[in-house]
Amino acid sequence: MAGMRIIVISDIHSNLEALEAVISSMGSFDAIFCLGDLVGYGADPNEVVDKIRMLEPQVVIAGNHDYAVVSGDTSGFSSHAALAVEWTRRTLHPRNMSYLAGLPHCSLREEQGLRLGMYHGSPREPLDEYVFPGTPEFILRSMVEYAGVDILMLGHTHMPMQVDMGSRYVLNPGSVGQPRDGDPRASYLILDLDDGHVRFELRRINYDIDSAAEKILSKPVPKFLADRLYLGY
């Protein structure tokens, strides 16, 4: 059985410059898994959704911002996040709104003899639960068992996480478009599967933050959304 290389991305948040830099760095791969939040915060929602559609990922699931843009429900969102959602709703083309509306909230599949589970938040709350780095291992194990998988892939926190629990793994690729771990570079994960064997590598990629931030400043959204790109938080 030939091995499989999967590119895992998440939390692009309408940041076209970051997404393009990540795509340029990917090299060869067999599949792309996108763990949600294509839109929100950033200045290029249509361009990002178009780019993802063009890539034809094997897995694309909805994040909480994607759901909020489709539904209009921003309950629980901060004021700056809600303003970005409202602007995105006014800006998004109908074809891209329909694409987001059709995204599932999770994906389960088997590859290379391993069961994979993809959620934006968690198996218990696919859109909204945060599973941060440092979460106790017994909690992570309970999530893996709840999902019935060998490898659990999550997004939402914008913080990379790779936890190896022997034959079970919890992975978060971090955020392409708005990292929050103190490193402003775009973040994604390379996952290599080969007949039950697992290897993974986190990659950080420089991108044109100035351009992404300037475009945000030209939109009717809070200035903070541009500033935080430089902070990585």
Indicate residue ranges for each PLM-predicted region.
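Core catalytic region of metal-dependent phosphoesterases/phosphodiesterases
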Residues: 2-101
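Active-site environment of divalent metal-dependent phosphoester hydrolases
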Residues: 13-18, 40-43, 65-70, 124, ...
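Short acidic-hydrophobic surface loop/beta-edge motif
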Residues: 105-113, 163-165
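Anionic-ligand binding region
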Residues: 130-173
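Acidic, His/Gly-rich catalytic cores of divalent-metal-dependent hydrolytic chemistry
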Residues: 151, 163-233
